[in-house]
Amino acid sequence: MNCLFYFVPVASVIALFFAWLFYHQMKKENEGTPTMKEIAQYVREGAMAYLKQQYKVVGIVFIILAVLFSVLAFGFGVQNKWVPFAFLTGGFFSALAGYVGMRTATYASARTANAVSKSLNSGLKLAFRSGAVMGLTVVGLGLLDISIWWVILNAFVHEASESQTLVVITTTMLTFGMGASTQALFARVGGGIYTKAADVGADIVGKEEQDFPEDDPRNPATIADNVGDNVGDVAGMGADLYESYCGSVLATMALGASAFFGDVDAQMRAILAPMMIAAIGVVLSIIGIYAVKTKEGAGLQQLLKSLSVGTNLSAVLIAVLTFVVFYMLGFGNWWQLSLSVIAGLLAGVIIGKATEYYTSHSYKPTQNLAESSQTGPATVIINGIGLGMISTCIPVVTIVVAILISYLCATGFSFDPAYISNGLYGISIAAVGMLSTLGITLATDAYGPIADNAGGNAQMSELDPEVRHRTDTLDALGNTTAATGKGFAIGSAALTALALLASYIEEIKIGLQHVGTAVLQVGDKVVNVAEATIPQIVDYYQVNLMNPRVLAGVFVGAMMAFLFCGMTMNAVGRAAQKMVVEVRRQFKEIKGILEGKQRPDYKRCVEISTKAAQHEMVAPALTAIIVPVVVGIILGEAGVMGLLIGGLGAGFILAIFLANSGGAWDNAKKYVEDGHFGGKNSVNHHATVVGDTVGDPFKDTSGPSLNILIKLMSMVSIVMAGLIVMIHG
């Protein structure tokens, strides 16, 4: 059975090889005219300058946290000695994936614009395969990190029994998710603040005050806006999904080791299954990537169908092969567990389709939102908020159904508390299923900003109108894939956070053993800590709704979602104000900009966004890290469980609302720009621009950042469980 593990590192190497191949194929393409190259260079320099500055800040935070974890591990003995090192590698690989994705995207945009001048299909394939570099790098590095730690810990960790060794190994591996979570938080929050400070600033002065079109080279903030697309939607999205991907696999491994404690063969099967499904998903994603192509002159719906062919092919194949994996591993309930995986896969598809329905201007909700512009910006805002609230229904019901189906399939269709560990394993394997085709799913997400930048490059380089029409078509597709990608990221974050919540209970068991607690008094029974089940741990800490500590934690967790959103929203507002002041200053002081005779000072706007993002991201990030520790110290283990439940419930629903309201406002504006309700530069268009400007931080800063918040709070709780147990017992 152990031989099957080696397929996992092989799959990671295959993913990284194809990422390298697609990158070099992209670099061989012509970058276009000297103007196109110059604009691409501006964007590339701005993106890399931001990334360099961000990694300096993140590096300092990582050093401080690594020292703290070292003190807890080597000084107080409340953590495994490997935790500080696992934490650092998790952050390093996440940062490396972001760097590779950003570098690829900034090189691909001008080449995509140039390829589109030949044919629409050439542009689509180039942009999509460049996006695939990000997708395959994330899954490749994620599986590589998991493989390395599995080999290292198997060689060095030896507990009293083989069963206990597997539990310690998997719970230790789970802590490298803390590194990925911390890096993801800074990438998402910092990237979101950067991109929306530039975007909102560019829109307020450029579109609303000067009637400039999108990506007008006369707008000083336009380069910063294009840099922001890469910073937020490539590096930020990549770090977010890297965290979910690794977190779901690692949580499933930890829950599998716990659920089948005492039966080493069953433990090994449960540990290998998520790694095998993820590895097979990598190979099938590559097959799906090669299936993406389109006809010349294709419209938005045809392009969407082209991308769907690749993602659907990968999803169908993984659904079929999941049955083979569980059967080969020797699970008695192999077909039921396969249904748990399929439940996760289908949930991802349904959430994506629901997001598309509520945010694409091909459907009634966004068309009706555009129609409301006839009575001014106030009704656009009101209807957009209402649309976002209603849009939460389908994703929430979908996740609820997926949780119940995956739980029941894993327990033999029983709610008996004796099988709760098996049920939680089923839920976590559903999260792995949802993320199994991340290689191609993330490719469609990263495609969006590449196509958007290609359109911006074509506009600023004043290319032929036909080329710009083609880049606009690819850009419209990118907006839709970006919106559905956000829905997918939120759904996967919810399932992953639920799996991490269950893993927190396992980490408490390890913490109890570290402080020397051998047995627990649970009701009338005396239970060995190493063999205690999840219901027994929950019972011991009185985790129920009658416990005021749990209730207090739930309220604090729900509040955290709104506090975090408020902090990130205000951060964008403050940064955008600085950008607006700078753009107005340039229009006033640099003569000839408005006439197109003098080039604006793009670099100054890039610097403003970079500094604002670095400064403003610190407070929300520290809040997310510190609050779970403070709640644990004050309210104990039961309070932390309440915190995680409250944060997950409120954060998941709020994230969907923000992402879909913002996406609908964006596409309502585009629907008007396509000639409906007065078209560009009409009064109605100005009303939708206001909606789009308000929606920018909704969909690209606060909404996506909540994904990280609900996972990071779980990860912080897991890593600090030993300290909380030492304080409270």
Task: Give the location of each predicted region.
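Hydrophobic packing and interface segments
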Residues: M1-G729
